[in-house]
Amino acid sequence: MAVQKSRVTPSRRGMRRAHDALSAKQLSTDPTTGEVHLRHHITADGFYRGKKVIQTKTSAVEED
């Protein structure tokens, strides 16, 4: 069982936890569709940086 050698001070504990904070997701808006998506990811419609890069099931049905 792990046992600490000496007590950890509140300052040391706080310095260790300084990098544990959560940050908000970086979101972008697609210029073509206006859809919000994660940075460097395609939208649900299959657009990336304003261009259609992948054929989605919903767009295949709409084209028929």
From Swiss-Prot:
One of its GO terms (biological process) is translation. GO terms for molecular function: structural constituent of ribosome. The keyword Ribosomal protein applies. The keyword Zinc-finger does not apply. Pfam families: Ribosomal_L32p (PF01783). InterPro entries: Ribosomal_bL32, Ribosomal_bL32_bact, Ribosomal_zn-bd. GO terms for cellular component: large ribosomal subunit. Keywords: Ribonucleoprotein, Ribosomal protein. Disulfide bonds: none annotated. Residues 1-35 are annotated as: Disordered. Transmembrane segments: none annotated. PANTHER family: 50S RIBOSOMAL PROTEIN L32, LARGE RIBOSOMAL SUBUNIT PROTEIN BL32. Belongs to the bacterial ribosomal protein bL32 family. This is Large ribosomal subunit protein bL32. It comes from Stenotrophomonas maltophilia (strain R551-3). The gene is rpmF.
